[in-house]
Amino acid sequence: METRDVIFIDTNVFVKESYFLENNSINKIKELAEDGYVSLLWPEIAFNEVKSHVVRDMLEAFEQVCCKNTRVLRNDEDFQDYCQKGKDVVEGKALKLLENFKSKTNAYIIPNSYCTDVDDVFRKYFDKKKPFGSGKKKDEFPDAFIIQALETYCKKWR
C-alpha cells in the first residue's frame, strides 16, 4: 500500500516565502504534491487567511508602484490609467495564483464544521495553553480553530 505524507502549511510560511515565487519552499511543496509525494490539508480558516494576506500584500505592492509620490511616471496617461484600473487586475491575479496552487496540489479544504469544540478553545485561552500564551493571545484564536479542525479531521479520517 502506497503512503504519502499529509502536510499543513501555516499562513506565516506563505507570507515568509512571498507566496508563490518560482523557486521557494511553497513551490517545492506544490511539486511534491503534483508528483504524489505529499497531500495538503488546508483548514478553511487558514485558506481564507492566506487569501486575505496574498490579496492585501499584492495590493500594497501595487499601491507602492502607483503611489501619488511616484514622480517619474505621474504625468504619463497610460501609467495613470493602469493605476486606476489595475487594482482589480492585481486582486484577480492574487486569487488566480492561490486557486492555481490549491488546484495543482489537490489540497483538501477542511470545512469550518470541523471546528466544533468552542469550549476547548476557550479553556486553552484561559489556561494559556498552546496556541495561546502571554502576549498577543487574542490574535491566536484563528490558529486555535485551525489546530482544532486539523485534529478533528485527523481523528476522524486517519
Each predicted region: which residue ranges?
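Active-site-proximal, substrate-binding regions of enzyme catalytic domains
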Residues: 3-157
